[in-house]
Amino acid sequence: MGSKVSVEESVRVVIVGGGFAGIAAASQLKSFGIPFLLVDMKDAFHHNVAALRACVESGFARKTFISYKDSFHDSFKQGKVVGINLQTQLVILESNEELSFSHLIIATGSNGPFPGKFNEVISKDQAIQIYENLVEEIQKAKHVVVVGGGSAGVEMAAEVKTDYPEKEVTLIHSKIALADVQLQPSVRRTVKEILLRKGVRLILAQKVTNLDQVTPNVAQENMELQLDKDSEVVNCDLVLCCIGLKVSSSSYRSALGDKMAEDGSLIVNDYLQVQGHENVYAVGDCAYINEPKMAYYAGIHARVAATNVRNSLIGKSLKSYIPGALSMLLSMGRNDGVGQFNGYYLGRCFVTMAKSRDIFVSKSWKEMGQTMPR
């Protein structure tokens, strides 16, 4: 990944957050031989891109949680970051422990509802069991409703209908077009066609008004979802929520509140440095960049930031990150998909081969230097 460099003893990069951006930054710094400490409140990386497959396939969840300690050893610290002191260059944990840094990479990611995101601070084995429990709930249900028709929502609906074609599956979305707004119209049309071909019922341009009164992820008979138009009611026995993604900003809000955009992400320059702080970088979902918040881009950000840490230490020019044409692959179940790469449409065969079969989990196990369980 990169040649090792000689650095002073005072150099230590602290990476806050162990999502896709965090593990990519850690792996890159490790290859450079630059001392780092990856900090996350959980004990394992969660491959949330593959979380939707873990909802329908028993045994798949154990492939989506990868131990930090087994990859990064003493360069990993489990703990919740509650503050950052930029003057003294300290990261403060909930336990009151202070971690010194010469450089800081903020990779806190985003939060959202289960099952697309998993935010509980429990052990890897307990987390895996929660997904296994959801598989059982989906198996029990006769009518599954997915709320939210963005990228996660359309993938979730496709996963359920692909593995359980006999079940009634309904997708409710507040807009007319499905998936990410920045995708080409042809890709978004294909998403709709795939769902309809699979037999998913689509309710578009409508919102659920009583979602806070419904228990998601648990199968129970005669649940009623109220829609905001025509007083329509949808009866179902399982609700899966794929809405409400928010940037995780609590760890840096007090220190960098004046550098935050409206959505809570951090304003960065072309080198991914936080505005006004040459030794502080923001990558992934918490970086304010005009592109969708995706694991693919998070990894690229992280490698650019890690490279810039190295370059700053050895006197080389910093590397710029300039967003290009959108690249996104949508897995529509294990046997279908659609997407685009650098603006070019990608059809079923390519996306199925590239993503839909294992949702890139093997790539993350390889990046973290571990063997994926079978």
Swiss-Prot record:
Residues annotated with N6-acetyllysine modification: 167
- GO:BP terms for this protein? apoptotic mitochondrial changes; positive regulation of apoptotic process; vitamin K metabolic process
Q: What class of enzyme is it?
A: oxidoreductase
Q: Where in the cell is it found?
A: Lipid droplet; Cell membrane; Cytoplasm; Mitochondrion membrane
Question: What positions are marked as the site 4-hydroxy-2-nonenal adduction?
Answer: 173
Could you tell me the keywords of this UniProt record?
Answer: Acetylation, Apoptosis, Cell membrane, Cytoplasm, FAD, Flavoprotein, Lipid droplet, Lipoprotein, Membrane, Mitochondrion, Myristate, Nucleus, Oxidoreductase, Transmembrane, Transmembrane helix, Ubl conjugation
Classification via SUPFAM superfamilies: FAD/NAD(P)-binding domain
Q: What is its main location?
A: other
Q: What is its EC number?
A: 1.6.5.-
Sites where the protein binds 6-hydroxy-FAD? 17-21, 53, 81, 285
Molecular-function GO term, any one: oxidoreductase activity, acting on NAD(P)H, quinone or similar compound as acceptor
Ranges annotated as spanning the membrane = 13-35
Cellular-component GO terms for this entry:
cytoplasm; lipid droplet; mitochondrial membrane; mitochondrion; nucleus; plasma membrane
Query: In this UniProt entry, which residues carry a covalently attached lipid of the kind N-myristoyl glycine?
Result: 2
Q: Which PANTHER family match?
A: APOPTOSIS-INDUCING FACTOR 1, FERROPTOSIS SUPPRESSOR PROTEIN 1
Name it: Ferroptosis suppressor protein 1
Q: Which organism is it from?
A: Xenopus laevis
